[in-house]
Amino acid sequence: MWQAISQQLSETLMFSYDIVEKVHLSGGDINECYMISDGEQRYFVKINSKDFLSKFQVEAENLRLLRQTDSVTLPELVLIGNTKSNAFIILNFLPTKPLEDTENSYKFGQQLAYLHLWGEQKEYGCDQDNYLGATLQPNAWHKKWSTFFSEQRIGWQLQLLKEKGVTFGVIDEIVEVVARQLLNHNPRPSLIHGDLWHGNVALSAFGPICYDPACYWGDRECDIAMTELFGGFNAEFYRGYEDIAPLPFGYTQRKEIYNLYHILNHCNQFGGHYLEQAQKSIDKILSY
């Protein structure tokens, strides 16, 4: 496998790249991750089964979408390929550490705000479906945000769970409540990261960096809500964001709805205590 990767990388770089070092990196729940080096240039490699190739192609498209905004910093795509039994994606390797200091947290908050203010789009969705972790994320275009989020986010996750024998109530009733609570909220469609927890943000030599997006055009509050779901963001991050793009009235209540999507996705992927967390969140939303 590594010989095939080395050969394809050499063809892409147009010089012989012989792997003399490879280090297995921890933290990947879905892929096997490595740092490789020829003694001079290092790269980040994610490896999975051969049928994962299309998912890597979607990831590359998500990176392209976000990079064109010139707002947030992301890894640079080098190569997508496959061997006889594996698919892989290669990105430039950037040594990182947790994003914790106030100066860079503030800077990242501003960068995220500029991302959310970039471009113009009249509908919600994306040209292609992508993945939130290992879960397919449907992105068919919709004109109404309440329809898009209630059906393609909450309803979708609830249906996947039902197929696994897990239910939190009547799906149509939950979807209807979510749609009703978002009915009068018509946010300007923003290109969002889509999976913005602290594990997908770090500090590199070039400043704050983010990766592993699941982007689509939606409500920018979804990104901010997720940063609060699992914590880990400095208070200066939020100050930097709101100095550029203040959050509108009603965010606190909508945050519960937006984070339910990610809790349900964790139910689908991991189960466990997320099931209880999801039920509590649904009960709270139904009580509004």
Swiss-Prot record:
Protein name as catalogued: Probable ketoamine kinase VV1_2562
Domain of life: Bacteria
Organism: Vibrio vulnificus (strain CMCP6)
Pfam family, one: Fructosamin_kin
Function (record text): Ketoamine kinase that phosphorylates ketoamines on the third carbon of the sugar moiety to generate ketoamine 3-phosphate.
The keyword Nucleotide-binding is annotated on this UniProt entry: yes
Any GO molecular function: ATP binding
Binding annotation for ATP: N92, F93, L94
Family matches, as InterPro entries: Fructo-/Ketosamine-3-kinase (IPR016477), Kinase-like_dom_sf (IPR011009)
Active site: D195 (proton acceptor)
Keyword hit for ATP-binding: yes
Keywords for the protein's UniProt record, in alphabetical order: ATP-binding, Kinase, Nucleotide-binding, Transferase
EC number of the protein: 2.7.1.-
Lineage: Bacteria, Pseudomonadati, Pseudomonadota, Gammaproteobacteria, Vibrionales
UniProt family annotation: Belongs to the fructosamine kinase family.
